[in-house]
Amino acid sequence: MSTNWRELFPTKLTFVIFLLYMSLFIGQGIFVTASQESNNSYGYNTVTVVLLTEVFKLIVSTCLYCRDNNLRSLVRDVQKDRNVLGLYMVPAFLYCLYNNLAFVNLATFDPTTYYLLLQLRVVVTGILFQIIFKKYLSQRQWISLILLTLGCMMKQVDFGSFYSDANDDSESAAIQQQLQSHNKTTSAETHAHGKNMSGFDFSLSAVFILAQTICSCLAGVYNEYLLKDKGADVNIFVQNVFMYLDSIVCNAVILLLRGELLDAFSPQNLGSIMRFSVLIIIVNNAAIGIVTSFFLKYMNSILKTFASALELLFTAVLCYFLFSIPIYMNTALAIAVVSYAIYLYTQSPVVNLGKVRPLSNLSDATTKSTDKRKLIDEEAAESDLDMV
């Protein structure tokens, strides 16, 4: 099916939203990496940063709600739907783990490898939908998921090793000598600045990236399975308030368990956060949640697919110029295969509509601000956020 660009970008505003959506997600990995010390550690408390991000988003959501209502009305809505507030604790906890693991994994992997490996969430989500919702995958869907997995695995392939069986003549000997020199350089650059740039290496870092992926998928599926009907009639900004309140509690509990709850807000620790390189992370991650809601309101899933593919490409290019992270053949091929797999998957994505009428076209998303489908899409999109 051909793509009508006028239909994808009906106004200049939609194109601006698309650029913002893509730029914010690219900036997420770039800003976190740029805020690291020379040994890839953080000179600030990352859990506190995640907590302050949730506080900032709570303030923004409250202000957006109060444009047409007042604080008293918000309190009434929270009391009326307090059972939904309790239900949000599960996805809030999962996203809390996801957001904190993002800092851990970006200290281990370079941003390009990190985003490539996170695409495995499409595979996990597809399998979970088949198990929980009995939404059996078609042949095309299975092919796309297999391609996506192979694309992520391709990041670890050393194409220089394919020349190891060459004949031992003068020409091949020269090639082997060059390859040995190249492999030494590659080995050093693969862990440049202490970063893992080869993908999975069957270590604790692989467990952490898998845990982050699974947390994202489980949180998204939980929202579909439990909150689709019970939360569909709740104002979207009230739903955001529920999520951010529960997220603040979860992050506070993590600080408490680590014995850092009081010390995290000491003048010294807050001073380490009140730097441009850290504050921009908080603002960027808060903006992601806001722009995503506009993205889903004015655009469709095809653009979301294009955005995911372009994020991988531009992240690799920016990391090359900003952090001198090389782009090898395996990285380029992995990005190409994963991007195509995502595109193929979205031609017939696995969805669970429940009791909600699906949108027939793009204009339906903007006709009614209370359209239930929009609420559900915004809720499900939380699983695609890198640090929400």
Swiss-Prot record:
One of its GO terms (biological process) is positive regulation of protein glycosylation. The chain crosses the membrane at residues 13-33, 46-66, 84-104, 113-133, 142-162, 202-222, 236-256, 276-296, 309-329, 331-351. It is found in: Golgi apparatus membrane. Disruption phenotype: Lethal in late larvae and early pupal stages. In immunologically unchallenged third-instar larvae, displays abnormalities of the immune organs, including melanotic cells in the hemocoel and melanotic tumors in the lymph glands; in the primary and secondary lobes, shows activation of lamellocytes and reduced numbers of hematocyte progenitor cells and plasmatocytes. In addition, displays hyperactivation of immune signal transduction via the Toll, JAK/STAT and JNK pathways; shows reduced expression of galactose-containing glycans affecting also spz glycosylation. Keywords: Golgi apparatus, Membrane, Sugar transport, Transmembrane, Transmembrane helix, Transport. It is a multi-pass membrane protein. Its main location: Golgi. UDP-galactose transporter involved in the synthesis of galactose-containing glycans. Plays a role in quiescence of the innate immune response, possibly by regulating glycosylation of the Toll pathway ligand spz. The gene name means 'Buddha with a thousand hands manipulating tools to protect us' in Japanese. This is UDP-galactose transporter senju. It comes from Drosophila melanogaster.
